[in-house]
From Swiss-Prot:
Species: Thermococcus kodakarensis (strain ATCC BAA-918 / JCM 12380 / KOD1) (Pyrococcus kodakaraensis (strain KOD1))
Protein name: Small ribosomal subunit protein uS8
Family: Belongs to the universal ribosomal protein uS8 family.
Keywords noted in UniProt: Ribonucleoprotein, Ribosomal protein, RNA-binding, rRNA-binding
Subunit (UniProt): Part of the 30S ribosomal subunit.
GO cellular component terms given for this protein: cytosolic small ribosomal subunit
One Pfam family named in its UniProt record: Ribosomal_S8
Length: 130
């Protein structure tokens, strides 16, 4: 059986493990996009360290959880967003103003909606975390 959306599977796995109180979680299969999303979550203090373990196949990410995630999910479909429209999407996916992050794939890489707004660039919404 194949995964239809590995990013959504990884984020729901992280959310479920946080709710049960686990300290670490293993995410497979690994991909560049999942790695970039984990990097953004690490920079914003939602997870601890993470590392890529080579299993001879697609790889596995081992993620340390610190108990700061209430909910994380993938945004489907991947909506295109202009720089001036982030507030509308923030109201739609986040529970309160300045609480949580939207993760955006831009031409300059994967970043939060706040960083993209500072740079004045748009992109595609791929996930939210709060």
């Amino acid at each position: 059986m194949t995964l239809l959306d590995p990013l959504a599977n990884a984020l729901s796995h992280i959310t479920n493990s946080e709710r049960v109180g686990k300290k670490e979680v293993y995410i497979k299969p690994a991909s560049k996009l999942i790695g970039e999303v984990l990097r953004v979550m690490l920079e914003n203090g939602y997870i601890g360290e993470f590392e890529l373990i080579d299993d001879g196949r697609a790889g596995i990410y081992r993620v340390q959880l610190i108990g700061k995630i209430n909910k994380a999910g993938a945004i489907k479909p991947r909506f295109p967003v202009k720089a001036r429209d982030y507030e509308k999407w923030e109201k739609r996916f986040l529970p309160a103003f300045e609480f949580g992050i939207l993760i955006v794939s831009t031409s300059q890489g994967v970043m939060t909606h706040k960083e993209a707004l500072e740079k004045g660039i748009g992109g595609r919404l791929i996930a939210y975390v709060y």
